[in-house]
């Protein structure tokens, strides 16, 4: 239907425009009126998109030709209110399609008005489809991006310390990719979001230590202390990965019992077991210990020597940690009925900077303990037993250690014969106990000193395999040795790891530190392995076939 063109003079008032609108409305109503039968009483509109809505919309422009005439239906004011801001233009109107209402005189059908709006739909609008169901109009307009995240933390061996997951927003991830990382440091190719952070895969450029420093500075400038960066090795493909986590997920675990109280309690028990270990009479009958406490004074000298070796071990850890900026928790001395003590368990509280720093701290304890223990062991073999302190033993006891047995054969010579009792200075056994405590802590397993040394030298993947092998061999030894049995139980429940991630795990330590680490592992192995050769050369014929 085409309306005839109309014109009006510029002097006509806005009332004429309203009258013209009423005229146009009556023409439109006449053209869109539906019969009472044959078509539905209500006109159903199905809007598929904003584009189709605009195509179906009808807009009529009416220009007044005559003087103002009265509005026939009197609905002009109400419809102008519905039009809102669009009604401010007197010559352009959005026209309402009506199928009849209770107030309409031209149609007797009881149907409600259907309004077509030419404005774009907002996200809160709904549109009725042909079946009368309401559907959101924003389905075709909303661009909501849903990011799936993996459970837990992207860091190896880290647990989520918070009750609720802390996710990094997508806007922050984009800033990290585009502005924090870059071609000169770490070129990101993909990312894997987690509840506790995000893991970036890509290509590392330049030296890892320098790249880490650059990325950390950019991260600090963009977000302050909100996030923490880690450069690790992906165990799946041995390629570098970058991990960014919120610092609040790195909060240390809290314990119900204060650390100093627990450490003091373990320390008191350890002192008692060190004294008890050096009193053979009480070892045979532990139940009589509290009835014969005065006998414990006989074990003071031996307890002091062993405690000195353990103490030097822990002091070396503390000094090395202070030099590298590593914070250590209070050491827990573990008591042992067999050798007096298993040494101390010392947790690392903060995040270690790199593998070389970890190697310095982990190797410092065994290096100091082995050094003091070895010197005291040599003195024990060299010094003759003094009056009242000589200890008579069977030389077969030296077969339990390759190092001690070899030194005994080298120093004592022909005096060392199978089946012949031998009087030695008790300093040998006291120092031997200290060496054994250092040796079992140097086993490359879990979070022991040896496990940390292996991790620092060869990385997480290789050290985890060595740790599994060491624990397996230790478990086999536990079938024949009670010390090994208790030690493997202790490792499994308290020290099995994994080791907490370092800030930068890619850079290897310097060769001189690696040499020290290898020497410590070998020395501990010599202390623990048995001496297989007979002390008397004449007995070699017993092994001939």
Curated annotation (Swiss-Prot):
Membrane spanning residue stretches: 256-276, 300-320, 325-345, 363-383, 426-446, 473-493, 513-533
Biased composition (Acidic residues): 68-85
Keyword Nucleotide-binding annotated: no
Signal peptide span: none
Keyword Acetylation: no
CDD domains per record: S2P-M50_like_2
One annotated Gene Ontology cellular component of this protein: chloroplast membrane
Regions of compositional bias (Polar residues) in chain numbering: 88-109, 117-129
Stretches for region Disordered: 66-142
Entry membrane topology: Multi-pass membrane protein
Residue interval of the organelle targeting sequence: 1-63
EC class: hydrolase
Keyword terms: Chloroplast, Hydrolase, Membrane, Metalloprotease, Plastid, Protease, Transit peptide, Transmembrane, Transmembrane helix
Organism superkingdom: Eukaryota
Record EC number: 3.4.24.-
Family, similarity comment: Belongs to the peptidase M50B family.
Free-text function comment from the UniProt entry: Probable membrane-associated metalloprotease that may be involved in chloroplast development.
Identification of the protein by name: Probable zinc metalloprotease EGY2, chloroplastic
Organism: Oryza sativa subsp. indica
Upper lineage: Eukaryota, Viridiplantae, Streptophyta, Embryophyta, Tracheophyta
Gene, per the UniProt record: EGY2
């Amino acid at each position: 239907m085409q309306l005839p063109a109309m014109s009006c003079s510029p002097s006509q008032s806005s009332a004429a425009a309203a009258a013209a609108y009423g005229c146009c409305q009556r023409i439109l109503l006449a053209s869109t009126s539906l019969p009472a039968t044959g078509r539905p009483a209500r006109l159903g509109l199905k809007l598929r998109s904003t584009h189709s809505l605009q195509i179906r919309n009808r807009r009529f422009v009416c220009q007044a030709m005559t003087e103002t005439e009265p509005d026939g239906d009197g609905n002009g004011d109400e419809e102008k209110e519905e039009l809102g801001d669009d009604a401010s233009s007197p010559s352009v109107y959005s026209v309402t399609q009506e199928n009849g209402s209770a107030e309409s005189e031209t149609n007797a059908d009881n149907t409600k008005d259907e309004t077509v709006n030419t404005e774009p739909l907002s996200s809160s609008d709904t549109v009725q489809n042909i079946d009368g169901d309401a559907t959101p109009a924003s389905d075709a307009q909303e661009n909501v991006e849903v990011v799936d995240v993996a459970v837990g933390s992207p860091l190896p061996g880290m647990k989520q310390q918070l009750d609720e997951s802390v996710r990094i927003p997508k806007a922050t991830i984009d800033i990290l990719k585009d502005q924090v990382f870059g071609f000169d440091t770490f070129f990101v190719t993909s990312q894997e979001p987690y509840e506790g952070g995000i893991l970036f895969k890509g290509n590392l450029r330049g030296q890892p230590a320098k790249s880490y420093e650059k990325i950390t500075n950019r991260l600090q400038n963009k977000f302050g202390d909100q996030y923490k960066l880690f450069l690790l090795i992906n165990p799946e493909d041995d390629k570098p990965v970058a991990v960014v986590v919120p610092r609040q997920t790195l909060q240390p675990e809290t314990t119900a019992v204060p650390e100093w109280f627990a450490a003091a309690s373990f320390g008191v028990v350890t002192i008692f077991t060190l004294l008890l270990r050096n009193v053979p009479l009480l070892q045979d009958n532990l139940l009589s210990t509290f009835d014969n406490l005065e006998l414990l004074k006989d074990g003071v000298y031996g307890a002091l020597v062993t405690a000195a070796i353990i103490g030097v071990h822990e002091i070396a850890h503390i000094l090395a940690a202070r030099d590298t900026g590593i914070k250590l928790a209070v050491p827990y001395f573990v008591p042992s009925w067999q050798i007096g003590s298993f040494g101390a368990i010392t947790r690392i509280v903060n995040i270690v900077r790199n593998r070389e720093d970890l190697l310095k701290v982990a190797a410092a304890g065994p290096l100091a303990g082995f050094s003091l223990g070895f010197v005291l062991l040599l003195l024990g073999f060299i010094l003759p037993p003094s009056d009242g302190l000589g200890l008579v033993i069977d030389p077969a006891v030296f077969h339990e250690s390759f190092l001690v047995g070899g030194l005994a054969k080298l120093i004592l010579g022909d005096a060392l014969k199978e089946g012949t009792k031998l009087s030695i200075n008790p300093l040998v056994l006291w120092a031997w106990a200290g060496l054994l405590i250092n040796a079992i802590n140097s086993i490359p397993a879990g979070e022991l000193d040896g496990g940390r040394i292996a991790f620092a030298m060869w990385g997480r993947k290789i050290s985890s395999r060595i740790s599994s092998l060491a624990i397996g061999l230790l478990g086999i030894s536990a079938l024949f040795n009670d010390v090994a049995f208790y030690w493997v139980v202790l490792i499994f429940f308290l020290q099995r790891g994994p080791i907490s991630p370092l800030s930068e795990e890619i850079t290897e330590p310097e060769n001189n530190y690696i040499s020290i680490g290898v020497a410590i592992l070998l020395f501990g192995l010599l202390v623990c392995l048995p001496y297989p050769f007979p002390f008397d050369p004449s007995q070699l014929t017993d092994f001939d076939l």
